[in-house]
Amino acid sequence: MGHQNIWYSHPRKYGQGSRSCRACSNRHGLIRKYGLNICRQCFREYANDIGFKKLD
């Protein structure tokens, strides 16, 4: 096993390591509700485009 094969060689089928943001591929702060699968930073950026409205 070379150096390239060691990292990320374990299968990721479930859990936090298996899911990533659809916009930036980040794995932290993921919003999965309603099937968004987008991290919270990208959600703040794209919320209006998706259709979320900020209420006063």
UniProtKB/Swiss-Prot annotation:
UniProt cross-references to Gene3D superfamilies, sorted A to Z: 30s Ribosomal Protein S14, Chain N
Official protein name in the record: Small ribosomal subunit protein uS14
Alphabetized Pfam families for the sequence: Ribosomal_S14
Cleavable signal peptide: none
Keywords of the record: Cytoplasm, Endoplasmic reticulum, Metal-binding, Ribonucleoprotein, Ribosomal protein, Zinc
Family: Belongs to the universal ribosomal protein uS14 family.
Record localization: Cytoplasm, Cytosol; Cytoplasm; Rough endoplasmic reticulum
Disulfide bonds: none
GO cellular component: cytosolic small ribosomal subunit; ribosome; rough endoplasmic reticulum
Glycoprotein found in the keyword field: no
The protein's required cofactors: Zn(2+)
Cofactor note: Binds 1 zinc ion per subunit.
Subunit annotation: Component of the 40S small ribosomal subunit.
One example of a Gene Ontology biological process annotation: cytoplasmic translation
Binding site for Zn(2+): C21, C24, C39, C42
GO molecular function: structural constituent of ribosome; zinc ion binding
